């Protein structure tokens, strides 16, 4: 699994490599979950290239299945993508907006935004 563990004084997360696939197929999400749990890390940062080919096409149902699995195991995922420029299906941006409100997945443009989201979430748990 090509995920890097980032450890900061008050924050830990796993991050996928830029411009490299991590999830080749839908079932690979189980490997990410296993790796996250093995590292005792509930925060995950992924880039579009890390996701399955159909993730940004809602008709594939891949986004829903992946996010549901992560949610079931208590893993918070930040997806680093600019939805104003990255190609996606017609209603994907609406789904991303709703996911951002739920608190388990956050679509944002930078890793710094993801770190801030993780920090807010971790602070709310204390």
List each language-model region with its residue ranges:
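Amphipathic, Lys/Arg-enriched alpha-helical "gate/interface" segment within cytosolic domains
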Residues: 2-126
């Amino acid at each position: 699994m090509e995920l890097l563990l980032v450890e900061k004084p008050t924050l830990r997360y796993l991050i996928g490599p830029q411009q490299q696939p991590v999830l080749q197929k839908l079932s690979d999400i189980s490997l990410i979950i296993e790796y996250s749990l093995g590292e005792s890390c509930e925060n995950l940062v992924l880039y579009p290239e890390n996701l399955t080919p159909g993730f940004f096409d809602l008709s594939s149902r891949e986004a829903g299945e992946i996010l549901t699995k992560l949610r079931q195991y208590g893993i918070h995922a930040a997806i680093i993508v600019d939805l104003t420029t990255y190609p996606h299906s017609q209603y994907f941006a609406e789904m991303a907006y709703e996911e951002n409100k739920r608190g388990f997945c956050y679509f944002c443009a930078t890793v710094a935004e993801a770190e801030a989201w993780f920090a807010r979430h971790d602070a709310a748990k204390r």
